Amino acid sequence: MRNEAAPLLIGVSARLYTPGAAGMPAQGVWSKTLHYLEQSVAWWLLGGGALPVMVPAVDATSIVQRSDIALHDYAAALDGLVLQGGNDVAPQSYGEAPLHPDWQGDRVRDRCEIELIRAFVAAGKPLFGICRGLQLLNVAYGGTLWQDLPTQRPQSLEHRVSGRDEQHQHAIEFVPGTRLAALYPGRSGSHTNSLHHQGIKDLAPGFVVEARCAGDGLIEAVRGPGPGYLAAVQWHPEFHAPGDPRLLDDGAILADFLTAAAAARRESVK
């Protein structure tokens, strides 16, 4: 039986590195397929008192196949799941063909994460998506994406500036009456980092928009329908330095997610 007092175990979907990436050496560890966890995500969760556990992906070339891995066992063993950022969502995952060779995305990761989403939702465990995680959650429930904002939505602000990464920022506005807005009483919005070139085009049925970019209206935060906890943001909360007065303090978002994870654990040990 799980100890309710033990630290929460939060799964983090793996980022994938495939050999042959431009500019990378073709020797040593770089000649291997890597599954990895960006350290800021780990530190963000650890800072909230949780223990991050990376969940690896498998594909048709793996020695271990999907049929050998019961994803519901991951969902049963862990208290929640974070979908971390990374490569583009593949256009094929939402019924489109890539408009440019650089926008192929990561179909393998898409498939694995969509299966993880289903397993955790079925187990009644909370999910939180970051950047790509927001986009994939939207796609998993029937939404679509802009493959490239500058090309397909030229009225958009710059949401990614080469060389600046998370140093690039813009203002967001909370949608009144939403759970996200309730976490920040008395505030209409804030500033966040921005380092993405894709974004939500068609919102998944039943999902609620919780924040938008103040400058162009692009969706920046969503919440899924039903009694479970499905939430995601387009920015990277793990890159926000605690106490930085220029940026949103994401501690309330993390605490809200971990509170849901603790509640899910209590339900699982009844």
What residue ranges belong to the model's regions?
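Active-site-proximal beta-strand elements of phosphoester/diester hydrolases
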Residues: 231-234
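N-terminal beta1-alpha1 cap of cysteine-dependent amidohydrolase-like domains
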Residues: 1-128, 139, 146, 150-184, ...
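Active-site loop->helix "elbow" adjoining a glycine-rich segment at hydrolase catalytic centers
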Residues: 132-134, 141
